[in-house]
Amino acid sequence: HLLQFGDLINKIARRNGILYYSFYGCYCGLGGRGRPQDATDRCCFVHDCCYGKVTGCDPK
């Protein structure tokens, strides 16, 4: 899912999503903890929650 999300970012933002956002904020990239730092980090948080619900996990 992370590679697909990176591809989406690349197409919409015209940035390499993997390189630019892999270590951005608290939720962009692998893992996630704490409070999202800004709107971009919140987007990654929402993506993680959505993906978690689809796969049966429920991140808070």
Curated annotation (Swiss-Prot):
Record-listed E.C. numbers: 3.1.1.4
Entry keyword set: Calcium, Cytolysis, Disulfide bond, Hemolysis, Hydrolase, Lipid degradation, Lipid metabolism, Metal-binding, Secreted
Protein name in the entry: Phospholipase A2
Family: Belongs to the phospholipase A2 family. Group II subfamily.
Active site residues per record: H47
Co-factor binding details: Binds 1 Ca(2+) ion per subunit.
Superkingdom of the source species: Eukaryota
Molecular function via GO: calcium ion binding; calcium-dependent phospholipase A2 activity; phospholipase A2 activity; phospholipid binding
Binding-site residues for Ca(2+), renumbered to this chain: Y27, G29, G31, D48
Enzyme class: hydrolase
UniProt cross-references to InterPro entries, sorted A to Z: PLipase_A2, PLipase_A2_dom, PLipase_A2_dom_sf, PLipase_A2_His_AS
SMART domains: PA2c
Paired cysteines (S-S): C28-C44
Subcellular location: Secreted
Positions of transmembrane segments: none
Gene3D superfamilies found in the cross-reference section: Phospholipase A2 domain
GO BP annotation list: arachidonate secretion; killing of cells of another organism; lipid catabolic process; negative regulation of T cell proliferation; phospholipid metabolic process; venom-mediated edema in another organism; venom-mediated platelet aggregation
Entry function: Snake venom phospholipase A2 (PLA2) that displays mild but significant inhibition of mouse platelet aggregation induced by ADP and collagen. In vivo, induces edema in the foot pads and gastrocnemius muscles of mice but shows no myonecrotic or myotoxic activity. PA2 catalyzes the calcium-dependent hydrolysis of the 2-acyl groups in 3-sn-phosphoglycerides.
Gene Ontology CC annotations of this record: extracellular region
Pfam families for this protein: Phospholip_A2_1
